């Protein structure tokens, strides 16, 4: 059975320079379209030389990011938003979210208007404008895999006084009728070999439409297959026997 090797590369948020590689345990992470996925992991401090591994400087929340390498391929990347040290267990716990979470902390702070502009171009411009702010550029590129136009032309006005966060602006745009999918993908640069991240947009949707004749469709097998376990939750707390509606009513008398 093939062995799966994971590496956890920690970088400076602004420069994307790798400043540490740490042996995390208890790692779990998710990837999502159109919103940031989550990451959590733990580092047993008692088992390593923290100064030699640059633990403190490489895990600063809001200042550092990390990439997850699986057998030489980057499969996750994002911003470290929290860390907690437990003195009893001597364990450092880290939480992070995918790179798109960074733009939930960036604001549209100037009046910005678009008239009859492709929705994918608007999304790209919002990301570019956020990174054009002082100390705002975290090196997110554009469309290494996705599409640059959709043919859907829209009007949008963002007022600076609203201070709308950039992630919400892009997400709202994607949720309209005839919208699109977006994600920040991670990969190794083919020239430098260093980690990179790209804002990709897909119209009408990311992925390949399912057909029974497509030999590349995913197949999940359980048990004794590629699925280890699954959960099937059921929740009766939202079941109702009677539905009620309330209207505006009128004044009595």
Features from the language model and the residues they span:
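Short, conserved phosphate-binding/catalytic loop or strand-edge motifs used
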Residues: 140-157, 190-197
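Solvent-exposed coil/turn segments that connect beta secondary-structure elements
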Residues: 46, 83-85, 97-101, 204, ...
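Internal metal/ion-chelating core segments
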Residues: 160-217, 222
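Amphipathic, non-transmembrane alpha-helical segments in extracytoplasmic/periplasmic proteins
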Residues: 22, 34-35, 40-41, 96, ...
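Juxtamembrane "anchor/assembly" segments of surface/extracellular structural proteins
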Residues: 1-58, 90, 95-103, 121
């Amino acid at each position: 059975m093939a062995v799966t090797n994971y590496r956890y590369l920690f970088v400076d948020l602004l420069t994307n320079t790798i400043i540490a590689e740490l042996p995390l345990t208890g790692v779990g992470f998710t990837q999502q379209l159109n919103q940031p996925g989550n990451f959590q992991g733990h580092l047993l401090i008692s088992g390593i030389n923290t100064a030699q591994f640059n633990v403190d400087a490489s895990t600063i929340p809001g200042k550092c990011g990390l990439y997850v390498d699986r057998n030489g391929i980057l499969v996750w990347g994002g911003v470290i938003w929290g860390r907690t040290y437990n003195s009893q267990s001597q364990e450092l716990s880290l939480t992070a979210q995918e790179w798109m979470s960074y733009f939930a902390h960036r604001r549209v702070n100037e009046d910005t208007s678009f008239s009859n502009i492709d929705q994918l171009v608007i999304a790209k411009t919002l990301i570019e404008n956020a990174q054009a702010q002082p100390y705002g550029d975290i090196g997110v590129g554009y469309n290494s895999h996705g599409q640059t136009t959709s043919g859907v032309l829209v009007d949008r006005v963002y007022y600076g006084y609203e201070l709308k966060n950039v992630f919400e602006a892009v997400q709202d745009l994607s949720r309209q009728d005839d919208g699109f999918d977006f994600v920040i993908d991670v990969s190794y640069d083919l020239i430098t070999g260093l980690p990179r991240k790209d804002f990709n947009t897909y119209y009408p949707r990311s992925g390949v439409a399912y057909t029974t004749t497509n030999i590349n469709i995913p197949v999940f097998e359980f048990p004794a297959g590629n699925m280890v376990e699954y959960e099937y939750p059921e929740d009766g707390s939202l079941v109702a026997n009677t539905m009620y509606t309330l209207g505006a009513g009128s004044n009595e008398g």
